Amino acid sequence: MLKSSKKEDSSKKNQNNNLIFTVRKLFSPIKNFFRTTKTPDNFFGVIKRLKINIQKMTLDERNILANLLELEDKTIEDIMVPRSDIVAIKLTANLAELSESIKLEVPHTRTLIYDGTLDNVVGFIHIKDLFKALATKQNGRLKKLIRKHIIAAPSMKLLDLLAKMRRERTHIAIVVDEYGGTDGLVTIEDLIEEIVGRIDDEHDQQLDSDNFKVINNSTIISNARVEVEVLEEIIGEKLKNDDDEFDTIGGLVLTRVSSVPVIGTRIDISENIEIEVTDATPRSLKQVKIRLKNGLHSDKI
């Protein structure tokens, strides 16, 4: 079972308190406006009309306010994890297989469960429920641990989704296309990051600004969501056919494996290319290491 030191717990608590303080400070004039106004405009109209002294705001406060203003027009399609990057577990798996797949030593919290194909997501399992089941030595299938998710269209506004998640008391939305198939995934964390900015933890590995770094003549580190075309241009090799449904390096990996790729999984993409999964969550690939057996041309390094 994972344990955090008191120092780490205290640091995380302080970070959370600072974030809460920033949000409360930023929203206090908005609350006062609603208290004194009988017929307020819509939320974004209120923010735009408020006489907020920008000069007295911290950088974090300015960023949050800017993100809120931009949120008005954003839809699920703008932020969702695409289908090709989703990693999920079959309903027929047992608890032992699930615990092995999500690597309990890495503190991910939720994993999707599907029946038959990814177009039939039946819900998700929270890691604390899995810990409890393993601690009490429960056996069998996953059905009794599954929590509900919600369904949403790509065109739904993010604020509408946030309100729906709150009403339904769930943290995961499956995005469906016009035919009812799974198009993508959005979590409550994705929505929060749209407001407060990206939230990294100690397990996130940082890359350069393009999330694609050539380490040496034979090694590349890449974010799994980098488009395959970027890799093709670097190595001078065609990896994606016109009829392929994936666009990203993560999608390329997922088309070559029959089971959930966990950290350490290695896949031969071609005679020249081997890809190793170096960072992943139960729902998506995050980072890969690309090994080139023939190496790169000197002008590409």
UniProtKB/Swiss-Prot annotation:
**InterPro entries in the cross-refs:** CBS_dom (IPR000644), CBS_dom_sf (IPR046342), FAD-bd_PCMH-like_sf (IPR036318), FAD-bd_PCMH_sub2 (IPR016169), Ion_transp-like_CBS (IPR044751), Transptr-assoc_dom (IPR005170)
The family database entries (SUPFAM superfamilies) matched by this protein are listed as: CBS-domain pair, FAD-binding/transporter-associated domain-like
SMART domains linked: CorC_HlyC
GO CC terms for this protein?
plasma membrane
Q: Where does the CBS domain start and stop, copy by copy?
A: 80-142, 145-202
Q: What else is known?
A: It is not know if this bacteria is hemolytic.
Q: What protein is this chain from? A: Possible hemolysin C
The scientific name of the source species is Rickettsia akari (strain Hartford)
